[in-house]
Amino acid sequence: MYVAKFVYADYSVTLMVEKKKVVALLSGGLDSTLAVKTMQKQGFEVSAVAIKTPFCDFDCGRGCGFEIREKADNLGVDLKTVYLGDEYVEMLKHPKYGFGSGMNPCIDCRAMMFEAGKKHMEEIGAEFIISGEVLGQRPMSQFAPALKKIEKLSGLEGKIVRPLSAALLPPTDPEKNGLIKRKDLGMIRGRSRKEQLRMAKEFGIEDPPNAGGGCLLTDPAFSLRAKDLFKHIETPTMNDIDLLKIGRHFRLDKNVKLVVGRNKDENEMIKVLALQ
């Protein structure tokens, strides 16, 4: 909400004008931060959604949330955190668009994240969804055909705006409807961070963050463990997945796998997971 004041010759009128709302997928990295800043600069009220999966590359595990909450507070946006658990495991069995170089179902994964964002968009009456995706930055999910597949799979065709690269992409519904203008959208392409760092300086962002967390399923060694798990267990539990993240793993036969801790802390973690 903001105040608009109109002054005439002999009187003035003050109106309360409600800002248009958008939903942002917020990872905590620089790109999603810049996407939020760009929309705020254009006068939108931004509400953020942070997505966690069992395979997010965070040392603090499933309880992680403080850092992203701090990022949201610094940006002045509301934050909703969504954890994709069992439904993510089900998707991982047979992703519609397959895997990347590891066991990473990037297109299906992004579609699930946008579906979560779509629910929040509908709940708060937002106009569209934004993300920090950059055209050509990631090999599987950030080229134009993949971006289109993600929109279709999530039921958000025309409703996803990627502010950092939007001027290089086809017009979205918000642009066609006059909510945003192409001249205010970015033309960033590829893996270089030069333009993002320039924007960070412009927005007064000190110590720009790196990428907002990674995915363990892109790691070659972890992917081998995950493939072995899904090969031998039809529906792995969250404990099964957490065990993949620690120790040394030895497949003894089709029914037995040995997990050995590499230190006292890992042994304690294995004990806790085994007793649950």
Protein language model regions, located:
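AMP-forming adenylation/ATP pyrophosphatase catalytic core
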Residues: 153-276
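ATP-dependent adenylation/nucleotidyltransferase module used to activate substrates
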Residues: 5-202
